[in-house]
Amino acid sequence: MKMTNLYFRRGPATVICLCLFSLLLAAETLTYREVEGEITVIHTVAIMPAPPGYSIELASLRSGGGVVRQTFRTAVDLSTLAWTFSDPGRQMELDARLQGEAIILSGTLRGKKVEKRFAAAGVPWIQLFQMGLGPFALANDKKFQFRSIGTQGPGEMKIGKFTVTRQGEEEIMFGGKEIIALHLRISLSGLLSIFWHGDYWYRKGDGRFLRYRGKNRPGGSVAISELSEEKVD
């Protein structure tokens, strides 16, 4: 993906991105609570305007201790320009960034040096797709594809392709009341789609990520993550 690559090819997408930009001019902090069996994770997302797009910090605090920290630099359409990942418990320290015609991944993994290079051309790189798919949720396209670098399982240290399929509008219970949400299903692309998919719901008014339901790992319990707090700084 080149830095000039836009989320969509048609004119309305530019309007959607500009609308999202105006909504996110102020710094925001979002908190999500995720439950997977007996495991609870609190995800805190801090979003700050940082031309040409945004700077995002994500801290994931797992019950029993241990924090995974990530940072993201994005374009205005929320596609990824740079990403860092730190998980001391798994001895993972990663840095990936868009450099010309390549995405360069470097760092350490369980004491071993990591150096990888992925072609940037093709579908967009969206590492934090919970946030990065807001523009698609608000558009009218039926399907969309993107890439993301894996940090666990068979896709670890690889860049995989994902397909997003629009499921339509749904009434869901959120915050004690019924609201209209936009339902997206994300899966691995092609034949790999049989191995994983997750369901994501976004607020109709502004494309805010509200809820996730799916399995985070093969054989694991179904995980449910939901927005619990929004704060404008």
Map each language-model feature to its residues:
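Surface-exposed beta-loop interaction hotspot
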Residues: 110-148
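Acidic, serine/threonine-rich low-complexity disordered tracts
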Residues: 27-102, 144-233
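Short intrinsically disordered, low-complexity segments
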Residues: 8, 17-18, 141
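Intrinsically disordered, low-complexity, compositionally biased regions/tails
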Residues: 15, 41, 111, 115, ...
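N-terminal compositionally biased, intrinsically disordered segments and leader/signal-like regions
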Residues: 5, 15, 72-75
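Bacterial N-terminal signal peptides
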Residues: 13-23
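Short, surface-exposed secondary-structure junctions/capping segments
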Residues: 61, 85-91, 104-110, 129-139
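N-terminal secretory signal peptides that target proteins for export/translocation
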Residues: 1-9
